[in-house]
Amino acid sequence: MKIKIICFGKIKDKNITALINEYLSKINHFTNLTIVELSEEKINNENSIGEIEEALKKESKKLIPYLENSFNVLLDIKGVQMDSIKFANSINQNLIISKDINFYIGSSHGISESIKNKFNLKLSFSELTFNHQIFRLILLEQIYRAFSILNNTKYHK
């Protein structure tokens, strides 16, 4: 099984990058995880709803190639919430049926409504809004925690 995190933009903070690399190293003891960074569409007028919608449509087209032959999880504030054990079990279920898992983090404006029905699961970690760079780190920590639970290591208490 392979896991991909598909997201928009690059990490700019060296400290966050170091922590991300630390979690990638830990996770890759359990499974193959890669991060795919797509370019975020530029928006000249942040107040233009039409321009934002057009950018989201373009970004959605970049996601389509990743949606086939995988269990696709959209990280969405309106998604279902689950605890770490249920999250680990969800990952394990896909391990059993040998499906790759793709996690999607939208751009700063989210994900186009037109593509949201293509995902197998919409998952929310909180009703809070997170910085995209920090959220990537939070997702990696939860994936590592899930594999720690599945492998009975001391990390999860």
From Swiss-Prot:
Q: List the HAMAP family hit by this protein, alphabetically.
A: 23SrRNA_methyltr_H
The UniProt family comment states: Belongs to the RNA methyltransferase RlmH family.
CDD domains named among the record's database cross-references: RlmH-like
The GO terms describing molecular function are: rRNA (pseudouridine-N3-)-methyltransferase activity
Q: Which UniProt keywords apply?
A: Cytoplasm, Methyltransferase, rRNA processing, S-adenosyl-L-methionine, Transferase
Give the EC class as a word.
Answer: transferase
Q: Which reaction does it catalyse?
A: pseudouridine(1915) in 23S rRNA + S-adenosyl-L-methionine = N(3)-methylpseudouridine(1915) in 23S rRNA + S-adenosyl-L-homocysteine + H(+)
**Which InterPro entries does the entry link to?**
Alpha/beta_knot_MTases, RlmH-like, tRNA_m1G_MTases_N
Q: Where in the cell is it found?
A: Cytoplasm
What job does this protein perform?
Specifically methylates the pseudouridine at position 1915 (m3Psi1915) in 23S rRNA.
**Entry keyword S-adenosyl-L-methionine:** yes
What is the protein named?
Answer: Ribosomal RNA large subunit methyltransferase H
Identify the species of origin: Malacoplasma penetrans (strain HF-2)
E.C. number(s) listed in UniProt: 2.1.1.177
